Amino acid sequence: MMRLLFVAVAMVLCITGAQAAGSADLKAAQAAAEKGTGDEAIQLFTQALTAGDLSADDQLTARKGRGREYSAKSLIADAFNRQDDGKRLRDNAIADFSAVLSAKPDDAAILIERGQDYHMNQQFDPAIADFSAALKLNASPSILLQRAASLRAKGAYDAAIADCTAALASDAHDANLDVWDIHNERGYAEFLAARYDAAAADFDKALELGASSRADDVLWLPYQIAWLHLAHARAGQDDTKQLEGLAGKVNVKQWPGTLIGYFLGQIKLEDISGASNHGAMGRARECNLSLFVGEDALAKGNREQARQPILRAREVCNIHTLQYLVAGAELDRMKN
């Protein structure tokens, strides 16, 4: 009898110890996530889950936490052009978020996060489905913009433009979303759809609304002016006077202001600032320069002259960027 009692006590102690270990790993994982030590957090979340003794709610908490860490790591992989690693990490995140949604299908935050990972993995249809489900729970302009980005990426330009228009008309307010940004996003979709007059109107509105809040951003204004000019040029409009006026607000001797000097014929292509010695920064500069030079050639009717720089943009631009998307659309149009 005593022997059976000792065995029972030992079993209780073992179970209690396992439960304590699982709970301790979960708390440690959350602490590691707070500190920004992603690898450690993933390991601890995994240990907590494999212990097999977490409550149902704690399992969901661990899945959410690990999924978010996988997503964060995937962005680092993308930054270093490790595309396969980025996709694998997002696949892991999607699996964790899917487990959470199996238990709580109305978790809008997780629907959005899974949608973002689907989008980054070029799986646009499931991304759109997740954003649509999230919109039924929370009709937010920022979610509309995220769905618009996925629609735009798959070539559904009309639907993307409609989502941006709905975001502009929404009575809801997102603290981290500016109206000028919505005009920009709609402008990009219109540009991709070859609706250049409409794109120019939206880029112009974005410039008007956003200039004061982005005054300290030395990159924002030159790029904004570049997109506005290209939309005008592709629409067959002569915007020289406006471009000359805007050029006075940027340093045309320093990148990316040199783009404006190039468009005005004040700077030759070979004289534009060379690529940065910093890898990612240099690729980003070459990406933008190649695309804008190609678009400028298209605006002047020089399709053959445009082909090589746009091909180069498609090669060097990160696959998650708008520039990569625009380059692909232009190359497809050149086939016709």
Show where each model-derived region lies.
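Helix-start (N-cap) detector for alpha-helical repeat units in TPR-like alpha-solenoids
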Residues: G22, A56, L60, A108-A109, ...
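Residue-level recognition of tetratricopeptide repeat
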Residues: Q30, R68, L75, Q116, ...
